[in-house]
Amino acid sequence: MTDNLQDLISTKLAAAIANPLFPAVDSQLRAGRHISLDQLDNHAFLMDFQGELDSFYRRYNVELIRAPEGFFYLRPKATTLIARSVLTELEMLVGKVLCYLYLSPERLAQQGIFSTQEVYDELLNLADENKLLKAVNQRSSGSDLDKQKLAEKVRAALNRLRRLGMIHGVGEQNSGKFTIAEAVFRFGAEVRAGDDPREAQLRLIRDGEAATPDSLALEKQADLNEVDDNDELEDELDDEEHA
């Protein structure tokens, strides 16, 4: 039995799975959380076993990615066996604003601490307020009630991003204060190659680009078509070999 297991799993992968850190790290990754350098033990664990764990997760049609900024996350393919959730357009936009704030001089001036109100104010400053209100309520008239609902949605978006490891709470639980993690660069990958990262991120915010269920469906269909094409190619090669 042991010999058969060794044929299926490498010694180093077995050591990774047996590590007491694995259950918590695995659960966090599967839940969509990003593991940054500030999680010293978990991050060091992933650094030590990155190759082995990437092979492990590929069996579920996901990849273990280490971003240029150093954080880890699971990137699912369309055929993933691990449940994936889609961020709303507002959540994506809030993420882009967080990336913009991360790049701002204010981050150093404020010791990296921001508030929910600052994110809300920056969102209104950078994006089209009417479009934001319409995203919350198609019949929005710009009333105080509509703005209150938008503020509630922004708070909910920040809570969702906190669970994904994008921000970390500071102080009391309901203080609304937080620091921004490097993982927000998931929303700003396009800015890495730009001459001015903040200007590039500002363009992304104004464009309001986001993944939607329709775009994900198209992605999945493209992947399935690629699989079908590969199967057909293999069949043709088999026919040629037997000819």
Swiss-Prot record:
Cellular component GO terms, alphabetical: cytoplasm; nucleoid
Purpose of the protein: Involved in chromosome condensation, segregation and cell cycle progression. May participate in facilitating chromosome segregation by condensation DNA from both sides of a centrally located replisome during cell division. Probably acts via its interaction with MukB and MukF.
Residues covered by region (Disordered): 214-243
Primary residence: cytoplasm
Record-linked HAMAP family: MukE (MF_01802)
Family, per entry: Belongs to the MukE family.
Subcellular location: Cytoplasm, Nucleoid
Biased composition (Acidic residues): 225-243
Assembly: Interacts, and probably forms a ternary complex, with MukF and MukB. The complex formation is stimulated by calcium or magnesium.
Record has Chloroplast as a keyword: no
Protein name stated in the entry: Chromosome partition protein MukE
GO annotation terms (biological process): cell division; chromosome condensation; chromosome segregation; DNA replication
Organism this protein belongs to: Pasteurella multocida (strain Pm70)
Record keywords, A-Z: Cell cycle, Cell division, Chromosome partition, Cytoplasm, DNA condensation
